């Protein structure tokens, strides 16, 4: 038997079981848990390589072979960190295992034939496309930024740079809902829109769900009163849709206790649950410990740094149409920004009490930084708190699975779309992101939508090879023409689908139904289901979880930052 060194093997086929990989320039290290490929029978494409006729490629017809194989990929997902070939068929994930030609190779579960395209995954990390569940649809250019960061699904509301949209994630009323669904047809991104949930009577909310809303958004700028909260949740229960809430910072219509009483035991997604993005001051963070609350953060406070507090005030004044000349407006802004609760938010993420991270795009958050900010938070906690209890000193697999779940599977579960997206599992849309380890979480090397490359860094189109400068992200064929309709998905309520809305509006994209939104609970938030008793001191803003004080220092330096953006 021929022997090859681990280094030589990793250089040729990528890391295998027991090998460790550093994520970008962070202090996070993964260790490969399992290798689904077979030593000596790995498949690789290229001159003199394996995937050639009669060798790694067989004679199967298209119906019996893959459309695409990603070879020797290092997969990071909530369910594991493994090395495998990834098969794609008809725009969906066909399997994770060993690819090749079963006529001459043992253990083949994914058949390569003449109709199979190849993406070389050797040395690359593959993750599921990210899901950003807090989008203000202020401008369509957000989609390009998000896609090129590794996000493939965006959920939220808005109509463009209207004053209401600048502040709230609502697409109000059937007319605007229809127009946004029509606009979505031209965007290479899975999209779902939230209607405005602030109403004390149900009819105006029902008509928005019937018009296609995947859920309803309660926002304090429209009045998040106990009456509107109760009514909105009643409609959601009847229509199997989710409710997202930005609670009452000013405590005008009640305190956090009143909001929680209005919610009762019904499921709700609480946006920016720490409070700097808005919510009962100073103690909305208490909600993250409840069984029916699905808590998320937005990325302006991720992670806590020496600059976090300073930049928030001006952002807040602009986004919520406040006047710096009015003392009450300034006091409103200042009440939302508390060092103590932001610091506690870092730790609550690390312990799995906060379940999701999103952007709050152009409304205090940066749409292209959800993934980067998530891993910066994980790094900061590793440096400040050490390894998680279940991780040995040599790797951070538990922490890595916890943090990747925050922007993939958990928002998918929260909004009833986990049957379509959110993880690398057979049957789901092949929304996949490839990364070189040195650039992980910062700059993808390829973004697939529905099994087709939608965006990638690309060099001069007039060059003799693909790599000459200037290299920058460019749209690829999967983002163009009718191919885009076959590889992107618009999410709608079941009520809208059953009433024939896609045909009425002439929608040509894939249609996904949101479902099981009302049965999901905090316990279903994978790796992020901790439910501590949270207490906030109303004078000092100190936060305790099960009696333990939560505090940490702001970071002065972060990885995944300037060194990656010199060019």
Curated annotation (Swiss-Prot):
One Gene Ontology cellular component term attached to this UniProt record is: cytoplasm
Q: Catalytic residues per the record?
A: 320
What does the PTM comment of the record read?
Carboxylation allows a single lysine to coordinate two nickel ions.
Q: Which GO terms describe its molecular function?
A: nickel cation binding; urease activity
Q: Which GO terms describe its biological process?
A: urea catabolic process
Top class in the EC scheme = hydrolase
Localization: Cytoplasm
Name it. Answer: Urease subunit alpha
């Amino acid at each position: 038997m021929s022997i090859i060194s681990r280094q030589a093997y990793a250089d040729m086929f990528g890391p295998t079981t027991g090998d460790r990989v550093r994520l970008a320039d962070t202090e996070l290290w993964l260790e490969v848990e399992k290798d689904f490929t077979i030593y000596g029978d790995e498949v690789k494409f290229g001159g003199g390589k394996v995937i050639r006729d009669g060798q790694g490629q067989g004679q199967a017809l298209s119906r019996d072979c893959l459309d695409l194989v990603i070879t020797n990929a290092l997969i990071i997902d909530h369910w594991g960190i493994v090395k495998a070939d990834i098969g794609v068929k008809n725009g969906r994930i066909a399997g994770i295992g060993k690819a090749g030609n079963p006529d001459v190779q043992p253990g083949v579960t994914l058949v390569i034939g003449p109709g199979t395209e190849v993406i070389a995954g050797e040395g690359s990390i593959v993750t599921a496309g990210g899901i950003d569940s807090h989008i203000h649809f202020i401008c369509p250019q957000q989609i390009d930024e998000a896609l090129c960061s590794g996000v493939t699904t965006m959920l939220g509301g808005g109509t463009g740079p209207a004053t209401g949209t600048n502040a709230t994630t609502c697409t109000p009323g059937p007319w605007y809902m229809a127009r946004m669904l029509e606009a979505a047809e031209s965007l290479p991104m899975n999209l779902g829109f939230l209607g405005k949930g602030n109403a004390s009577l149900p009819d105006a909310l029902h008509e928005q769900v019937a018009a296609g809303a995947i859920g309803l958004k309660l926002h304090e700028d429209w009045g998040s009163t106990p009456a509107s909260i109760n009514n909105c949740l009643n409609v959601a229960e009847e229509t199997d849709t989710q409710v997202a809430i930005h609670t009452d910072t000013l405590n005008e219509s009640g305190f956090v206790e009143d909001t929680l009483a209005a919610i009762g035991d019904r499921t709700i997604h609480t946006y920016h649950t720490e409070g700097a993005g808005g919510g009962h001051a100073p103690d909305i963070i208490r909600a993250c410990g409840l069984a029916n609350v699905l808590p998320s953060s937005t990325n302006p406070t991720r992670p806590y740094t020496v600059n976090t507090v300073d930049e928030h005030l001006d952002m807040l004044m602009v986004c919520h149409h406040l006047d710096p000349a009015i003392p009450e407006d300034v006091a409103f802004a200042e009440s939302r920004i508390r060092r103590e609760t932001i610091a506690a938010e870092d730790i609550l993420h690390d312990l799995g009490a906060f379940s999701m991270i999103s952007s709050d795009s152009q409304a205090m958050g940066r749409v292209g930084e959800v993934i980067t900010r998530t891993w910066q938070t994980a790094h900061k906690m590793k440096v400040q708190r050490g390894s998680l209890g279940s991780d040995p000193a040599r790797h951070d697999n538990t922490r890595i699975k916890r943090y990747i779940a925050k922007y993939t599977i958990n928002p998918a579960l929260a909004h009833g779309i986990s049957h379509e997206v959110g993880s690398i599992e057979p049957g789901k849309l092949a929304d996949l992101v490839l990364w070189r380890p040195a650039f992980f979480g910062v700059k993808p090397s390829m973004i697939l939508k529905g099994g087709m490359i939608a965006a990638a860094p690309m060099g001069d189109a007039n060059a003799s090879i693909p790599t000459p400068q200037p290299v920058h992200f460019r749209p690829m064929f999967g983002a163009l023409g009718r191919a885009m309709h076959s590889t992107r998905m618009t999410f709608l309520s079941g009520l809208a689908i059953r009433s024939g809305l896609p045909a009425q509006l002439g929608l040509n994209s894939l249609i996904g139904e949101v479902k099981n939104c009302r049965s999901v609970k905090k316990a279903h938030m994978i790796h992020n289901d901790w439910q501590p008793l949270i207490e906030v001191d109303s004078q000092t803003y100190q936060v305790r979880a099960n009696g333990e004080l939560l505090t940490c220092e702001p970071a002065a330096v972060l990885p995944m930052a300037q060194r990656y953006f010199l060019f």
